[in-house]
């Protein structure tokens, strides 16, 4: 079995990287051609701004047909960190998902509020606390004060960051780091 290594061609930041689709909220879903530059820019900002490192353990919980999957795959790979991918049967079982997060020492989670509620329910069922969690990056829907408070109980060390972005603006165009000591009656999308 011979191995032949060939040189890869250089990638221009303006070249298309992937195609993703809008939700179709204004009618038919539209295909969006995303270039390399915004994703690379986001990943560089994300890893540096939040001090993400090769020692972190990332979860890949995004659906494979949803554009956050690019963030969930390429962020950890860009810094040499581990990416943990649960079985689908684990993702839909709150107790199994809580056990999986704890067992794998997950430190970075990107999640939607409904997924957060699933994790919180599983943690409650298991009596689990996630001391290894460093960051919870929220997006995709409004983060309620009640869910924020419930997640503070099960992940007391985690920094909570609310992301906002659209399909047309890859990954996040605004963010807000939630201050646990502030009045968080309404958690902003960010700026």
Give the positions of each predicted feature:
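Conserved AMP-binding/adenylation subdomain of ANL enzymes
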Residues: 30-59, 66-107, 176
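Adenylate-forming AMP-binding core of the ANL superfamily, especially NRPS adenylation
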Residues: 1-44, 85-86, 131-191
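Short loop/turn motifs at secondary-structure junctions
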Residues: 105, 129-132
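A general structural signal for stabilizing positions within well-ordered secondary structure
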Residues: 7-10, 49, 98-100, 127, ...
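Short, Asp-centered acidic motifs that coordinate Mg2+ and/or phosphate
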Residues: 57, 107-108, 135, 159
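Active-site catalytic pocket residues across diverse enzymes, especially alpha/beta-hydrolases
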Residues: 50, 81, 122-126, 155, ...
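Short strand-turn motif at the edge of the Rossmann-like AdoMet-binding core
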Residues: 61-63, 87-88, 112-113, 141, ...
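Short gly/Ser/Thr-rich phosphate-binding loop of adenylate-forming enzymes
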Residues: 91-98, 113-126, 135-159
């Amino acid at each position: 079995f011979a191995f032949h290594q060939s040189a890869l061609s250089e990638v221009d930041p303006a070249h298309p990287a992937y195609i993703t689709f809008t939700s179709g909220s204004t009618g038919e879903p539209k295909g969006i051609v995303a270039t390399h530059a915004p994703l690379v820019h986001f990943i560089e900002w994300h890893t540096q701004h939040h001090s993400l490192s090769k020692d972190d353990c990332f979860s890949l919980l995004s659906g494979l047909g949803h554009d956050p999957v690019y963030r969930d795959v390429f962020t950890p790979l860009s810094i040499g960190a581990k990416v943990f991918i649960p079985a689908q049967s684990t993702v839909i079982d709150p107790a199994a998902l809580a056990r999986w997060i704890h067992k794998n020492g997950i430190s970075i989670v990107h999640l939607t509020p409904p997924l957060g509620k699933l994790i919180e329910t599983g943690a409650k069922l298991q009596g689990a606390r996630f001391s290894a969690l460093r960051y919870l990056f929220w997006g995709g829907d409004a983060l309620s004060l009640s869910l924020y408070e419930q997640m503070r109980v099960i992940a007391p060390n985690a920094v909570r960051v609310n992301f906002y972005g659209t399909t047309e603006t890859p990954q996040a165009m605004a963010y807000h780091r939630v201050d646990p000591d502030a009045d968080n009656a309404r958690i902003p999308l960010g700026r």
